[in-house]
Amino acid sequence: MKKIAIFAKVHDPRALAVAEELIEWLAARGVTAHVEEHLSKRLRRTTLAESSESTEIAADADLVVVLGGDGTLIAAARLVGERDVPILAVNLGSLGFLTEITLNELYPSVERCLAGDFEVSERMMLMASVERSGEVVELHRVLNDVVINKGALARIIDMETSVNGRYLTTFKADGLIVSTPTGSTGYSLSANGPILHPELECISLTPICPHTLTNRPLVMAADAHIAIKLKYAPDESVFLTLDGQVGMKLLSGDVVQITKAAHVTRLIQSRSKDYFEVLRTKLKWGER
């Protein structure tokens, strides 16, 4: 691997310290690290690394190393986009369902990556677009979830939902979560959505506080084309949030279209633990 990109949580002193150590470690092995410009400005020793815009780094990296939590990883995954570059995600955060590599595993894992000795877990992504008056006004790639929800003081919202052109129902709820299997342990889980193994290919729909108690979470095939039309937006205080990081206000009549993305996120797996161990640890199963 010739080009290794490092993304770190720039406001976390621990992540910055680890980034500096990793840059030196790579330089000692003849490998130049590439970092984002805003990260480079926060590092004390930058002569051993090259810096440029985040999109440029992601465009031709052979490996992406993420230092932080799940949010840092999700942002990096969207930047990598269509290139299917392997991502080594190191957990410096708190919960960390996605960043399963521990700090103790960092250097042995990078060593194996340099030697081409690693395994990846391929995670399905979604494409989400917003149509307004017949025109696409937003288009984004999503790793975790697409969320439609109302403002704090708004009333219930009506979301006319169809799958593959066939009417499903009109959800009357505080919102609706459309999630990948990877995102099933995020906001969807908090709304009583199902836990889906991350290597499955499917899409879940989970209403948030539905008016009708029989509106339960649904799991759709991965090739489902989901269309959600906002029938009623009280005081126009309805928002679309993508991966909890990108958002916009929705208007009555807007249509959110969601399909499976053509590319996946490739996460390098830990050699010391499997997905079920991560679930047990993070959700504290078996504890009293």
UniProtKB/Swiss-Prot annotation:
GO MF terms held by the record: ATP binding; metal ion binding; NAD binding; NAD+ kinase activity
Needed cofactors: a divalent metal cation
Keyword Oxidoreductase belongs to the record: no
Cell compartments where the protein resides: Cytoplasm
EC number from the UniProt entry: 2.7.1.23
Superkingdom in the source lineage: Bacteria
Chief place of localization: cytoplasm
Family: Belongs to the NAD kinase family.
Protein name: NAD kinase
Gene name, Swiss-Prot/TrEMBL: nadK
